[in-house]
Structure formats: structure tokens, C-alpha cells
Amino acid sequence: MPRARPREETSATWSLLPLQNPMAVAMHRNIAQVPLTSEPVMELGLDVSFEDVAIHFSQEEWVLLDKAQRLLYCSVMLENLALVASLGSCTGMGDEDVTCEPAEEVVCNTSPSPQETHLLEIPVPALEEAWHQNEFLSTQPVQTLDLSRTGSGLKEDSNRHWKSYSGEKSCERDSHRATAMSSCRSHGLTEPFIRGKDGEEALSSIAGVQQQGACHSEQPSTGCLQQQATCIREQPYSSAKCGQALLNGEKHCKDGECQKGSSCKHTLVQCPSASSEKRPSECSKYEKAFSCSYKHAQHQDSHSGKRTHEHSQHEKPFSKKCRLNTQDRICPQERPYKCTECGKAFIYKSELVYHQRHHSARVHYECVECRKSFTYKSNLTEHQRIHTGERPYQCEQCGKSFRQNSSLFRHHRIHTGERPYECSECGKSFRQIFNLIRHRRVHTGEMPHQCADCGKAFSCKAELSQHERIHSGEKPYECSECGKYFRQFSNLIRHRRVHTGDRPYKCSECEKSFSRKFILVQHQRVHTGERPYKCGECGTSFTRKSDLIQHQRIHTGTRPYECEECGKSFRQCSSLIQHRRVHTGEKPYECIECGKAFSQSASLIQHQRLHTGERPYECSECGKSFSQSASLIQHQRSHSGEKPFECSDCSKPFTHKSDLIQHRRVHTGERPYECHDCEKSFSRRSNLVRHQRVHT
């Protein structure tokens, strides 16, 4: 039975407790405090029970204690309980050598759990129950002990003491338990928060003490029984409604109505007094309501793509603070969960289970529109936005919207200029990590994606997909203006500029604009004089790589472009296109001055100089100017005496290639120019013109 208190205790009395030590607390309650060593008790042969050293509080008194007083109270009670347990297990009768029954040791649950963190908030009757439960102690074998030097009667009294709690005082414990449960429910707690896992009491997680009994073993090296408990895990959030706090008293997440706190934002418990149907916060974009304002704020962040919480070490952003806290607890280098199929490692077990669906090839979710199947529901949700056209994530800067939140987050880096992914080899940075991975293959030379038809390898899968359309002939992108199809979407975008006349790339030197960026880069080399592409055979340099490739065909003799009509082959694709117009008679380039048409744009440009009188090519020797660069080159040979064209039959050299062609007709007898009036033929066109004057 609890001891009768000799005097009335008030709240003012309890406010002085933080200034007193455990001994003073016990003296204040007129309860004898047993020293924290068992030797004096052994020598005096006292009959000690746990009730002799216990301190009892009512619920009204317990509420008045602050967190330091509660922790001190629990620590002292654990010490006393450990001491009484060691005394009860190490005493015997008389001078006989007996073997003690297996003692029970205080075992602490070191695994973190929500139940442990709520321990200091439960009322004192529930703590009293926790001390007297048999499940609180786990059995540990003890060595055979020599108890001849100990007093008699302690074991019997101790056994009677524990029996009284398990038998005679069962009704009292039941009433304590009922009171504790009702009090806990009023605080928003239920029984699982009081009892630990597998029946162990939550009290086992309180910061405890290590006690050694003064028992003597037959073997000198055998240690005595030890009891210890571990420190309680601090939780930064608590319930302010009940007037209780935990160790540090911080409350990061609060419900607006009941001011109840939580250790994580997404686990904030709603006040039981609040109506479950009341949802004061509503999204203005979607008709979705939230019971807590912080959830509404998180939902709105998902539309804007904000990630307000950033890890201090890894500079990784998070949209929720609880995910940031998880990142603090586990370093990304620690990935304990490894896939047995592909060897990929993960930080969390749930991620491993999520990943293993790829290997199982199970299809769970199917689109009702196109019957496409997906392994994960989130992928199906994102896919369905293609059919609905929904783009819920909008950029606040430019108004561009996206189907996925991650796409909006990456898009924000265009406005901020952030490039978080840097190459360790060359220092080049990128906005997206897959661009960095693809760039690294430039240094390593890795080409993991290979074409099954021609064996050509590529550094990224997108390039392989585009290349495979060459074999399949697929051109999925169609121009809405002219109906022309393209293999790549980027080619369609560039083609549209033909219709719109858009030239977004402008030269800063001469104000000339271009429809494509790489053409601007090539043009700027005219101003800088840069010629980065050099021929390994003759040392000739070029401003464009395509010019170098075409030039190298002169050395190799390669003519990959062949005409289907006459079989003539060419080194350049543009030359083949121009040649085909000879067969079709197409002349798309027309002079606006005289209406004369040409098959090549270069011929039109040269012709227009006749109307303008422009002669941009001037000889540096004599100052004579020409309208065509070829004419200037031919003229300069008259000063140098160079005759590069030689006849293979008679070895006669010529200054111009046209002169060589006409000369060879002397050896072949060819006369391609024929008069329509008398059917007379000539080897030169000039001779035909002179002959036709006879008929006129």
C-alpha cells in the first residue's frame, strides 16, 4: 500500500523540486531512500522491498512537473528497481550453497520507435504499472553463487514482494492501468504508445543506470549481475495542448487549431476535438481541400516546383523538410539494400522493392486510352496527361507549363542559370545530370548503344533511336504548313523557320542573322579567321568540318552520291541535287530584273552582278576586277604562267579546264554542237555560233 503523506503538498511545494536531488525528493515524501549500492544493505540484513524505495505521484502532481523533474524521477526509480531486483536474485538461506534461479535483467530497447519518444508524456500511474510488469524484465542466466556470506530471509521477502504485485495487488494495478489509458487517450495517445514492441514496456527506453550487485561467484572471474538502460531518444515536437514537453521542447509543425506538434510534417496528428470533415484550406487551382495549412502550402509548392529545404552538405534540395531530415540521418554513400539481379544499391528498402518490379516484368496498370501498360501507378498518371493535355506544373517566370514536377524543377535552372552538375575532367557544367553522364562518354570514349542493323555505336540512346529511323524510313514529325516529314523533332523546328522567316541567331560583329546556331558559329570564324579543321594529307584548313570531309574525298577518290538517271557520281550531296535538275529541267532560281531562271543559286547571284555592275573580286597584280571568283583565279594564272591542266594524250598544258576539254575533242573526234538547219556539227560552241550567222 502507498505510504500516507504526513502533510498537504501544494503546487508551490513541487515548484521547488528542480533544486533538490533524489535524496531530498525522497525525504520530502517521508520515504526512506536506499543508497545506490547494495553493500550496506547486505551487511545489515535488511528486508527491502521495492515499495520501500518507491515514490508515488498523483496525476495532478505529475502534470506540475517539468521535463527535467520527470527525467530525474524516472532515472531514480530505475536505479531503485535495478537494486531491488539484484538483491532479490542473489540472497539465500543460511550457510547453504544454493544455485540462484535465473535473475531478471533490465533490457533496453535500443531501436527507435514512436512509442519510446512519448514516454515522458504518459501519466505517473502508467509508469507505476510499467515498473511492476513481469514483461519489463528479460531473463538472463546467472552463474552459480555462494551466498553463505549474505543475510537470510531477503529472498523469501523479495519473492513475496513480487508475488504481491502479481497477485494481491492485481486489482490495484488494473485500476492504475485504466486510469493511465484514459489519461493517455485524453492526450491523443493510445495503448501502443505506452507499451513497447513484443510486450516490452516503453519504460525500458528511459536513460538508466548500471548497477552491480555484491554477489560472490564460485569462479573469481565471473562478473556480477548488471542492469542498465539506454538514453531516451529526443523528439523535437510535442503536444502543447496537454501542457507536456519533451527534452528540447521545439515544435516545428503545429496544427492551427490545437497547437499540437509532431516530429515530422507529414505525420502531424490532428486534434481529436477537430471535425474530420472540416478542411479550411483549399487549392485555388484544383478543387482539393486540406485540413492543415502546411499541407496546403506543400501542395502549392508542387505546382511551382519549389524545393525550399536544402541539405547543407550535399546541396540537394527537398520539397519537404521531413525528407531533408531523412537525408541528414543517412548519407547517400551508404546504400545497404542491394538488388541481387543487377547489383544496384539503394538507401531504403522500399526503393529496392520498388526497383525489383523491373526484373519481375509484372504489369500492374494499363492506360484505357491506348492500352499501354506501366509497372507503377505514378507512371500511368503522368502518361494519362498526354491524352488529357493536362500540364499542372507552371513556371512563374515565363508561364510555361509541364506535365511533371521534376520537369518544372529542371526548367527553373534556365532562369536561375544554375548548373549543379560539373564534369571532373574538363570543368564543364550542366543543368541536368543525364547531360553530364552523356558528356563523360566524350572523355571515356564509351559507346554503349549499338545499332542492330549496321553496327554503328552511339553514346546516348536518343541518338540511336534517331539513327534507327534511317533504316526504318520513319519520319514521325510533319510540318503543318507544307506537309513535309522529318525524322527528328529538332529538324522540324528548324524547318518551320523557313515559313516564319525567324532568324533568332544574330552576329554581334556584322548584325547578320541566321536561322540555326551552328551556322552563326561557323560565320563568326570569318571575323576571327579561325580554321579549326585541318587536312592530315595536305595541311589545308577549313572553317567547317563538313568542308574538311568533302575535301578528304579528293585524296580518297570517294564519290558516295550517284545519280539514278545517268549513273554519274559526286563527292557532295549538293552537287547531286544540282545535277538532277539537268534531267528534270527545274530552274527554281529566277532573276527579278530580267526573269531569267537558273538551276543553282550561285548562278543567280553571279547573274545579278550583271545588273548591279558589282565586281567584288580584284586582281592584286593589275587591279582588274571580276564578278566571279573563278574568273579571278583563271586571270591570276596569266601573271604566274601556271598551266595546271594537261592533256593525257599529247601532254599539252592549259591554263583553263575548259580549254583542256575542248582540246581533247581533237583526239576523240567528238563534235557535240550541231546546226539544226544543215546538220553540220562542231567541236566548240563558238564555232557553231559563227556558222549560224551564215543561215541568218
Swiss-Prot record:
GO molecular function terms listed in the Swiss-Prot or TrEMBL record: zinc ion binding
Cellular component per GO, a single term: nucleus
Domain of life: Eukaryota
Pfam families to which the protein is assigned, alphabetical: KRAB, zf-C2H2
Annotated Gene3D superfamilies: 6.10.140.140, Classic Zinc Finger
Covalent link Glycyl lysine isopeptide (Lys-Gly) (interchain with G-Cter in SUMO2), residues: 349
ZnF (C2H2-type) residues: 337-359, 365-387, 393-415, 421-443, 449-471, 477-499, 505-527, 533-555, 561-583, 589-611, 617-639, 645-667, 673-695
A biological process term (GO) from this entry: regulation of DNA-templated transcription
Residue ranges constituting the KRAB domain according to the UniProt record: 48-119
Subcellular location as annotated: Nucleus
Keyword Zinc carried by entry: yes
Keyword line: Isopeptide bond, Metal-binding, Nucleus, Repeat, Ubl conjugation, Zinc, Zinc-finger
Region (Disordered): 300-319
Family listed: Belongs to the krueppel C2H2-type zinc-finger protein family.
Protein's job: May be involved in transcriptional regulation.
Record protein name field: Zinc finger protein 551
